Amino acid sequence: MLKDLFKKSKYATVNPSAYKSKVVEEKPNIPSGMWTKCSNCNSMIYYEDLENNKYVCTKCNQHFRISPKERIKQIFDKDTFKEMWKSLKTNNPIDFEDYEEKINKSQSNTGSKEAVVTGVGRINDLEVACAIMDSFFMMGSMGTVVGEKITRIVEYATENNLPILIFTASGGARMQEGIFSLMQMAKISAALARHDEKGLLYITILTDPTTGGVTASFAMEGDIILSEPNTLVGFAGRRVIENTINETLPESFQKSEFLLEKGFIDSIVERKNMRAYLYKILILHGVNKYE
């Protein structure tokens, strides 16, 4: 009896490594790319739901950045968009170090030669010329080829009496091309002035982000200026301005809603309504059906 009082209890032992391996084995196998995170509300969104909602957050209505290919799919009649000057590609006019590598990387990532797609297409059978900037290609920065392609499509619209739509999405002039990139601001604006002299319609649609030299030139020259919700629109960065004027800017500063309030843009249009809204504007301005 006394022996039993001082007898050690028997304990079961667990092998931690065996338990750990079992837990690993039981983890669900979730394929990558099924979910994505909203940059605005941090919600996790099922990618298929996002795609079906035109890449707009189903929780907070944040408009995700989209490629020109997706934009064409959403705006134009099926199989009517014809891309023009697709083969134009950038050289290195000022021999900027590593510039070719950055271009090659962007081309590989996006499948595009440059940061803008230009061409003609139809919206409910109304023919328009169009330029769509690509924020995924070096942040949509404007170099010589971007400037040349936009100028050419504006000139094509002028010669063929077509309205022109430009979807802007850019970080501004491309620093790797120096003064040559800045020259594109005046070049595009001059082409748009000739388009305007013929009494033709020019609509700009500001998408996130629209900044720098693009904002300072053709983005704000439209006869009608539209924007997607919560779009960043500005010239210099917020911190640069605050440090220059030594003041704290409003939270909504450089957002499309702020610009609408101050009269810089005409309307904020949600992506799901953009095609119908553009069609109404084109009809009101007497754009004829495609023949």
Curated annotation (Swiss-Prot):
**Keywords linked to the UniProt accession:** ATP-binding, Cytoplasm, Fatty acid biosynthesis, Fatty acid metabolism, Lipid biosynthesis, Lipid metabolism, Metal-binding, Nucleotide-binding, Transferase, Zinc, Zinc-finger
Cofactor(s), names only, from the UniProt record: Zn(2+)
Stored InterPro entries: AcCoA_carboxyl_beta (IPR034733), Acetyl_CoA_COase_Trfase_b_su (IPR000438), ClpP/crotonase-like_dom_sf (IPR029045), COA_CT_N (IPR011762), Znf-ACC (IPR041010)
Q: Which GO terms describe its molecular function?
A: acetyl-CoA carboxylase activity; ATP binding; carboxyl- or carbamoyltransferase activity; zinc ion binding
Compartments (UniProt record): Cytoplasm
The top of its lineage is:
Bacteria, Bacillati, Bacillota, Clostridia, Eubacteriales
Q: Which domain of life is it from?
A: Bacteria
Task: Please give the catalytic activity noted in the UniProt record.
Answer: N(6)-carboxybiotinyl-L-lysyl-[protein] + acetyl-CoA = N(6)-biotinyl-L-lysyl-[protein] + malonyl-CoA
Record note on cofactor: Binds 1 zinc ion per subunit.
Quote the gene name from the UniProt entry. accD
Q: Tell me the route in metabolism or biology where this protein functions.
A: Lipid metabolism; malonyl-CoA biosynthesis; malonyl-CoA from acetyl-CoA: step 1/1
Q: What is this protein called?
A: Acetyl-coenzyme A carboxylase carboxyl transferase subunit beta
Quaternary structure, per UniProt, is:
Acetyl-CoA carboxylase is a heterohexamer composed of biotin carboxyl carrier protein (AccB), biotin carboxylase (AccC) and two subunits each of ACCase subunit alpha (AccA) and ACCase subunit beta (AccD).
Q: What is its EC number?
A: 2.1.3.15
